[in-house]
């Protein structure tokens, strides 16, 4: 009997060893799968040519076949992982190198004469920052787009939503320091609103010289609308007009309204956990390292509310689609998110004292506010108050009845038509868009 049990145990040991080896290989396969995951994104989310993608696929398979011949030991596993890391890093590098903005083509797929579609670095304040420059005719007026944030990147979003602006403008989309492709352009810990203003000024001087324009238009959305006011206030001689949408006016009052709104929403739906969280952190202002996290607690509530509001026409951004845009390499896609956490937290706490109702009541350029009626992220009542106080050579407050914080997304057609068929017509001669 003892011998029988001994023989059974002897037979079970190889099975246990085999099962253990299989489990160990599965455990090793999990981090390897995570390591090579970026390579799997190349075909659908980057501009890396197919031939280069095939080379990376061959490298992965070749390395796997080669290393598997040497057995399964700790040393071999470490070498295997190191090889996959090296291949993945090369793939990430390739995605950065080949990132580009799509060409502007006619119906036959040919490049349009005099068109421009480039993505390039420009030196601003001693740092290399990125821009896209797009337009069907490089002789058209120049329009500088200032993205939301701070830390936000909207290269792909703006290209897709505002494509028709390229018919009448040279549209320049600036990747601000600490955002997207310019995430590492500067020491983010030292970023200030003034740095954005001076960089924008230097960029405009560059654009004037490059395109032979005395003045440019500026379109700012959300944070970009506040930055735009600051820039045109300091350098009015450089601008044909300012267009603000999702207009930020007074940051502290704005965010306290958002906080109260979010708290009320949570109370109405009986979400006591969210109520407790909001009450624990209290209303803004916030300072320190968790500004972005605390601000997100109520700002996400406002965006979720607008996303569910049937009065708003187009419910907003397609973040996954934007992340898949050809302008972003794989590292840029990571910084798409990092900018809205790291950079936002650093800069936003420096904006609590900004109130244009006190600090910018007189501007020397034509002003246009394109405002969503249902915006609960930048309350329109603050924009109305500012508009009534403001003196300018020309000013208009234009309502978008089916929009929230982003009329340029919610009512794209009307937004573009307003800029081209109304604003551009007033400021200069141009044919109406069909």
Residue ranges and their predicted role:
Residues 195-215:
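Conserved acidic catalytic loop of the alpha/beta-hydrolase fold
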Residues 166-183:
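Conserved alpha/beta-hydrolase
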Residues 363, 369-371, 375:
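Short beta-strand/loop motif that positions the catalytic acidic residue
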Residues 231-286:
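A catalytic-pocket lid/entrance helix-loop region that shapes and gates access to the active site
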Residues 403-416:
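Catalytic histidine-centered segment of alpha/beta-hydrolase-like enzymes
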Residues 153-162:
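The serine-hydrolase catalytic nucleophile loop
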Residues 155-156, 178-191:
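Glycine-rich "HGGG/HGxG" loop immediately N-terminal to the catalytic nucleophile
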């Amino acid at each position: 009997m003892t011998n029988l049990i001994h023989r059974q145990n002897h037979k079970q040991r190889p099975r246990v060893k085999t099962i253990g080896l299989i489990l160990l290989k599965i455990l090793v396969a999990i981090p390897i799968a995570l390591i090579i995951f970026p390579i799997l994104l190349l075909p659908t989310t980057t501009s890396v040519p197919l031939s280069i993608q095939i080379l990376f696929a061959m490298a992965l398979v070749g390395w796997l076949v080669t290393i598997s011949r040497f057995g399964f030991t700790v040393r071999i596993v470490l070498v295997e992982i190191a090889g996959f890391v090296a291949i993945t890093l090369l793939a990430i590098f390739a995605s950065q190198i080949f990132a580009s903005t799509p060409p502007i083509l006619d119906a036959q797929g040919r490049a349009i004469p005099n068109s421009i579609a480039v993505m390039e670095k420009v030196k601003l304040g001693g740092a290399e920052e990125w821009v896209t420059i797009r337009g069907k005719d490089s002789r058209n007026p120049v329009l500088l787009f200032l993205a939301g944030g701070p830390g936000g990147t909207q290269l792909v979003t703006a290209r897709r939503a505002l494509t028709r602006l390229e018919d009448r403008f040279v549209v320049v989309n600036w990747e601000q320091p600490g955002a997207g492709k310019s995430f590492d352009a500067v020491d983010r810990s030292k970023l200030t609103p003034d740095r954005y203003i001076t960089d924008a000024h230097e960029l405009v001087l560059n654009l004037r010289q490059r395109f032979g324009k005395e003045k440019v238009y500026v379109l700012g959305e959300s944070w970009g609308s506040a930055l735009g006011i600051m820039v045109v206030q300091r350098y009015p001689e450089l601008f044909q007009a300012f267009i603000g949408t999702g207009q930020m006016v007074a940051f502290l009052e704005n965010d306290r309204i958002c906080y109260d709104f979010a708290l009320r929403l949570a109370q109405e739906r009986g979400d006591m956990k969210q109520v407790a969280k909001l009450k624990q952190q209290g209303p803004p202002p916030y300072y320190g390292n968790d500004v972005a996290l605390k601000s997100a607690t109520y700002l996400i509530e406002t965006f979720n509310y607008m996303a569910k509001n049937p009065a708003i026409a187009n419910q907003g951004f397609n973040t996954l689609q934007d992340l898949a845009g050809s302008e972003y390499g794989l590292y840029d896609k990571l910084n798409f998110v990092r900018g809205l956490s790291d950079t936002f937290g650093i800069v936003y706490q420096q904006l609590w004292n900004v109130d244009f109702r006190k600090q910018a009541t007189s501007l020397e350029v034509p002003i246009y506010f394109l405002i969503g009626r249902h915006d609960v992220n930048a309350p329109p009542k603050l924009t109305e108050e500012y508009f009534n106080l403001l003196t300018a050579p020309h000013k208009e407050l234009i309502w978008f009845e089916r929009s929230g914080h982003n009329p340029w997304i919610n009512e794209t057609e009307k937004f573009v038509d307003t800029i081209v068929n109304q604003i551009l017509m007033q400021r200069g001669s141009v044919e109406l868009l069909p």
